[in-house]
Amino acid sequence: MATHKTLLMCLGLPLFFPGALAQNHAPPGCSPDLDPLYYNLCDRSGAWGIVLEAVAGAGIITTFVLTIILVASLPFVQDTKKRSLLGTQVFFLLGTLGLFCLVFACVVKPDFSTCASRRFLFGVLFAICFSCLIAHTLSLNFLARKNHGPRGWVIFTVALLLTLVEVIINTEWLIITLVRGGGQVSTPGNGSADWTVTSPCAIANMDFVMALIYVMLLLLAAFLGAWPTLCGRFKRWRKHGVFVLLTTATSIAIWVVWIVMYTYGNKQHHSPTWDDPTLAIALAANAWTFVFFYVIPEVSQVTKPSPEQSYQGDMYPTRGVGYETILKEQTGQSMFVENKAFSMDEPASAKRPVSPYSGYNGQLLTSVYQPTEMALMHKGPSEGAYDVILPRATANSQVMGSANSTLRAEDMYMVQSHQVATPTKDGKISQDQSPKNKTRW
């Protein structure tokens, strides 16, 4: 008998060795000591896991950097209307970051924890993003019509309440589905019956999609709510409505594709192994749609001032008023229509900006002969004509029309010598009264 048992064991060992080797065999690119649950993250024969892992990792880094930029730009936001939306936009970025992280749960092989996180977080994270878009469109509708919208905490509360509805729905659905899938068993030694909980991976694809009806309604509401912002009176808010419209339209296309593939396409082609890649691709594609079509444009617009603030900056300049400012103001006055009847008598130099120091010729005032009234009163009536002291306009108009406003002593002497040579009405010749020969008082 012992000989027969030994012979059977020797014949049966080759039959069990291939199965044992197959269980311990690791795919190319993975370590033999690695848990088989994570083979898709390093399997080079099926590259979809590695590609999605790289795409999701890049998305996590990008979203994290954009979140830091958005929070750091808070002190530089001049428009109070845009500042009130920063809390909702940061909440949106956290939801997008969660979508990129959930891609890894869809890449690894299913077990109880990964399937539970997929079923619960898939709808909750999308509800966060779509609720923030709805709250943003609600604010944009007020801004596009009245140029003032709700306060920031009101917008954030709307997004938070819409998200909590999906949290409640998913929690109840997951509990009811898992308990309903189990059977009723009796506990030994106890008269009551207990309910066994089935695995969340056993949930049908159609049931999973039906649980996302509320999320689809949020997506549709965000898409329809973005259209009225394009018809508002204040046009500067239209571009924000365009950002939301592009994001929701692309998301609708992605959701239609992955739902058709998840519920119909994979069954028709008899490839249920593509269920997990379908969910992972949908998550990564929709998350990058949020980043490219909504987050990056909004971050680039958040620090731009409003037109009202730009107008106030032009009305009240902060720089000082100097000589350059005066010249600019004089140049700006040329845009008005002038009366040409008076502009003909003005010299051409008056049309150019004149420096305040252009009238100074470098001579001191002591060289100018200007007798005071007291000196004339003490001196008495002069022998000469009054036009010697107060010269009239003569042929020498070049002296009077010069840029200097005072007469020089040499010019006065030339006028007096000209009048001395002219006989007076009494037939006498006026004496040469040069300013140099007069006694000073």
Curated annotation (Swiss-Prot):
GO molecular-function term, one example from the UniProt record: protein kinase activator activity
Glycosylation positions in this chain: N190
Extracellular-facing ranges: 23-49, 106-119, 176-207, 262-278
Membrane topology, Cytoplasmic segments: 71-84, 141-154, 229-240, 300-441
Pfam families, alphabetized: 7tm_3
Modified residues (Phosphothreonine): T422
Lipid bilayer topology: Multi-pass membrane protein
Keyword Glycoprotein: yes
InterPro entries: GPCR_3_C, RA-inducible_GPCR3
Record-linked PROSITE patterns: G_PROTEIN_RECEP_F3_4
Signal sequence region: 1-22
Region feature Disordered, mapped onto this chain: 419-441
Keywords assigned: Cell membrane, G-protein coupled receptor, Glycoprotein, Membrane, Phosphoprotein, Receptor, Signal, Transducer, Transmembrane, Transmembrane helix
Residues with the Phosphotyrosine modification: Y413
Location of the protein in the cell: Cell membrane
Residue numbers carrying Phosphoserine: S343, S382, S402, S405, S434
Name under which the protein is recorded: G-protein coupled receptor family C group 5 member C
Organism field: Rattus norvegicus (Rat)
The encoding gene: Gprc5c
